[in-house]
């Protein structure tokens, strides 16, 4: 393995861990306490959809691009997590019976198989909406 490949893989792993931690926090019950009451099942299904899988390449590219422009820090990680929520939304909806009708995603049952179709639709919609909320939050502002 070359030194450059190892450095890239290390950077990707660090970013993946940071984004995973951010997603865990953004989708945690504590962070949503001030929001409208979300059904526990919906929150669990949202977490199922985006946590515990994937290389996090999209947020890595976003965060590294932000770094090139001097926009580092928590705001960039929040934006990366929001980007991953949008990606999660697209996968959940793509897996639905009306689309690809996939049974597995990343080696485990898709959201509509693990829960049900109605929950999967709501999960995708909620992830997309939450991503917009995260991006609009002043805490995501990388210019500060």
Stretch-by-stretch model annotation:
Residues 24, 36-144:
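Mg2+-dependent prenyl diphosphate-binding active-site environment of isoprenoid biosynthetic enzymes
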């Amino acid at each position: 393995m070359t030194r450059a490949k190892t450095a890239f893989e290390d950077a990707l792993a660090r970013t993946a861990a940071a984004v995973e931690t951010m997603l865990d926090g953004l989708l945690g019950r504590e962070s949503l306490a001030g929001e409208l009451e979300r059904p526990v099942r919906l929150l669990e299904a949202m977490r199922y959809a985006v946590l515990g899988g994937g290389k996090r390449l999209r947020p890595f590219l976003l965060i590294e691009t932000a770094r090139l422009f001097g926009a580092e820090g928590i705001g960039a990680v929040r934006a990366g997590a929001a980007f991953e929520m949008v990606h999660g939304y697209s996968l959940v909806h793509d897996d639905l019976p009306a689309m690809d009708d996939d049974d597995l995603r990343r080696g485990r049952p898709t959201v509509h198989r693990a829960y049900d179709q109605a929950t999967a639709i709501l999960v995708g919609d909620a992830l997309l909406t939450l991503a917009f909320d995260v991006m609009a939050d002043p805490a995501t502002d990388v210019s500060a």
